[in-house]
C-alpha cells in the first residue's frame, strides 16, 4: 500500500467533498495518520471529545472512503497522542527537531512547536517556575542545575521543558537537546539490555548538552533504571550539561526513589507550579482564542474560567468543546451555549456559591417585598417575618459570620440574627406551610 501519509491526505481530500465546511474544519482537518498495522488504520484525534465524536459519526464514512481509494477494507481506530496537552482543531505546523539531521547516531526527539516561552501564559501559580526556566534556557548549566519542576497534571510543566529546548536550539543550533519521558527512558534502557546495546544507549543520553526528562516519578521502584539514570545524571552534571526534570510531586515525596537520586535532584533548584487563578485562566483562554483566530465573547471566557479551575489542559479542552458545539448546531457562541456544551464535563459535585444578597432576592420574590426592605427599620409583620427567614437561610446556607449577616440586614446586631434563626427553626418544626415555603426557596437557590 502507498505511503500512509499520502493515503490519509487523499482520503481527507475526498471526505472534504462529502462534508459541510464547518464539519470538516471542526472534526477532520486536525486528524493525522498514525500507523497501519495489518488491516487496522490508526488515526490520531486531538482529544477525547473529538475521538468519541469521530467514532460515533464518521467511522463508516472514513472506512468507505479508504475502500474507494485502495479497494481494501480496513478497520479504523482513533487514538489520542500520549504525553501531550490539549491540542486544537487547527492543522499543526511543522515540528522542530531537537537535533540536527546529520547527527544520525543521535536520538531524533521532537519538541512541540507550540510550547515556547512566547505562548506560555504567566500567572501567580507559575511565575517563579517560568523565571527559573528562562534563566536555565539563557545560561544552560550555569543558573540552576538540575532544575526540578513539579506540579499536577496539565499545569504547564511539559510546556516549560519544551520552551527551554526551543530557546536553546534557537540560540545555539548545534546544541544537542533531548526531551523524553522517564517511561521512554526506561523502555529504551530495557530494550538496550535485551538487544545487548547498553553502550549505545549510554552514549546516546550521556552525550547531550541539555537533557529534558519528563515525569521522573515513573522511575519509582525501578532499581536498575534508577541506577542507569544515576550514572547518566552524574556524567552530564560533571561535564556541565544542563538537566531539567519534571514530576507530579517534589523529590522527597516520590516513593521508593533512591536517596542518592533524591539528593542529586535537590542540588539545584526545585520549583512548583500550582493551578492557575481566575485571572490567569481567563488570560489563557484569551491567548488560545487569539492564536486560533476565534472571536469568543468575554462572558463565555469568564464562564469557562469559573467552571474549569483544575488545570490548563481541561481549560483549553472546554474551549475546544464549546467552539465545536457551536459549529455543529450552527449557533453563535454565548454563555448559554457554553453551559449546554459543557454540561457533561462540569463536575456536578461542584457546589454553587450562595450569597446573602441572592437569598434576599429569592425570599423577596416569594413574599413580594423589595430588597431595600431587608435593610430597612420596618417592623411590620409583612416585612419582619420574611427578613427573619432570610436571616435563617443566611445562617444555614452561607459561611458568613453572625456580624456579617447582621451587616447585610441593615447593620443589625448579631443577637438579632440569632433570635431570627431560633424563631424560624422552632416554627419549621410544626408549620407545614412554612416548611414548603422554605423548601421552595432553597430549591431556587440551589
From Swiss-Prot:
<feature type="binding site">
    <location>
        <position position="154"/>
    </location>
    <ligand>
        <name>ATP</name>
    </ligand>
</feature>
<dbReference type="Pfam" id="PF11638">
    <property type="entry name" value="DnaA_N"/>
</dbReference>
<dbReference type="InterPro" id="IPR038454">
    <property type="entry name" value="DnaA_N_sf"/>
</dbReference>
<dbReference type="InterPro" id="IPR020591">
    <property type="entry name" value="Chromosome_initiator_DnaA-like"/>
</dbReference>
<dbReference type="GO" id="GO:0042802">
    <property type="term" value="F:identical protein binding"/>
</dbReference>
<dbReference type="Pfam" id="PF08299">
    <property type="entry name" value="Bac_DnaA_C"/>
</dbReference>
<keyword id="KW-0547">Nucleotide-binding</keyword>
<dbReference type="InterPro" id="IPR024633">
    <property type="entry name" value="DnaA_N_dom"/>
</dbReference>
<comment type="similarity">
    <text>Belongs to the DnaA family.</text>
</comment>
<keyword id="KW-0238">DNA-binding</keyword>
<feature type="binding site">
    <location>
        <position position="156"/>
    </location>
    <ligand>
        <name>ATP</name>
    </ligand>
</feature>
<feature type="binding site">
    <location>
        <position position="155"/>
    </location>
    <ligand>
        <name>ATP</name>
    </ligand>
</feature>
<keyword id="KW-0067">ATP-binding</keyword>
<dbReference type="GO" id="GO:0016887">
    <property type="term" value="F:ATP hydrolysis activity"/>
</dbReference>
<dbReference type="InterPro" id="IPR003593">
    <property type="entry name" value="AAA+_ATPase"/>
</dbReference>
<dbReference type="Pfam" id="PF00308">
    <property type="entry name" value="Bac_DnaA"/>
</dbReference>
<dbReference type="GO" id="GO:0005524">
    <property type="term" value="F:ATP binding"/>
</dbReference>
<keyword id="KW-0446">Lipid-binding</keyword>
<feature type="region of interest" description="Domain III, AAA+ region">
    <location>
        <begin position="104"/>
        <end position="332"/>
    </location>
</feature>
<dbReference type="InterPro" id="IPR027417">
    <property type="entry name" value="P-loop_NTPase"/>
</dbReference>
<keyword id="KW-0963">Cytoplasm</keyword>
<dbReference type="GO" id="GO:0009295">
    <property type="term" value="C:nucleoid"/>
</dbReference>
<feature type="binding site">
    <location>
        <position position="214"/>
    </location>
    <ligand>
        <name>Mg(2+)</name>
    </ligand>
</feature>
<keyword id="KW-0805">Transcription regulation</keyword>
<dbReference type="GO" id="GO:0008289">
    <property type="term" value="F:lipid binding"/>
</dbReference>
<protein>
    <recommendedName>
        <fullName>Chromosomal replication initiator protein DnaA</fullName>
        <ecNumber>3.6.4.-</ecNumber>
    </recommendedName>
</protein>
<dbReference type="InterPro" id="IPR013159">
    <property type="entry name" value="DnaA_C"/>
</dbReference>
<feature type="binding site">
    <location>
        <position position="157"/>
    </location>
    <ligand>
        <name>ATP</name>
    </ligand>
</feature>
<feature type="region of interest" description="Domain II">
    <location>
        <begin position="83"/>
        <end position="103"/>
    </location>
</feature>
<dbReference type="GO" id="GO:0006275">
    <property type="term" value="P:regulation of DNA replication"/>
</dbReference>
<feature type="region of interest" description="linker">
    <location>
        <begin position="333"/>
        <end position="346"/>
    </location>
</feature>
<dbReference type="GO" id="GO:0005737">
    <property type="term" value="C:cytoplasm"/>
</dbReference>
<dbReference type="InterPro" id="IPR018312">
    <property type="entry name" value="Chromosome_initiator_DnaA_CS"/>
</dbReference>
<dbReference type="GO" id="GO:1990101">
    <property type="term" value="C:DnaA-oriC complex"/>
</dbReference>
<dbReference type="InterPro" id="IPR010921">
    <property type="entry name" value="Trp_repressor/repl_initiator"/>
</dbReference>
<feature type="binding site">
    <location>
        <position position="215"/>
    </location>
    <ligand>
        <name>Mg(2+)</name>
    </ligand>
</feature>
<feature type="binding site">
    <location>
        <position position="158"/>
    </location>
    <ligand>
        <name>Mg(2+)</name>
    </ligand>
</feature>
<feature type="region of interest" description="Domain I, interacts with DnaA modulators">
    <location>
        <begin position="1"/>
        <end position="82"/>
    </location>
</feature>
<comment type="function">
    <text>The half-life of ADP-DnaA is 1.5 minutes, of ATP-DnaA is 5 minutes at 37 degrees Celsius; in E.coli the half-life of ADP-DnaA is about 45 minutes.</text>
</comment>
<dbReference type="InterPro" id="IPR001957">
    <property type="entry name" value="Chromosome_initiator_DnaA"/>
</dbReference>
<comment type="subunit">
    <text>The DNA replisome assembles sequentially on oriC in this order; DnaA, DnaD, DnaB, DnaI-DnaC helicase. Oligomerizes as a right-handed, spiral filament on DNA at oriC. Forms an ATP-dependent helix on DNA at oriC; both DnaD and YabA inhibit formation of the DnaA helix. Forms an ATP-dependent oligomer, formation is stimulated by ds- and ssDNA; monomeric ADP-Soj inhibits oligomer formation. Interacts with DnaD. Interacts with YabA, and via YabA, with the replication machinery subunit beta sliding clamp DnaN. Interacts with YabA via domain IIIa (residues 109-275).</text>
</comment>
<dbReference type="GO" id="GO:0006270">
    <property type="term" value="P:DNA replication initiation"/>
</dbReference>
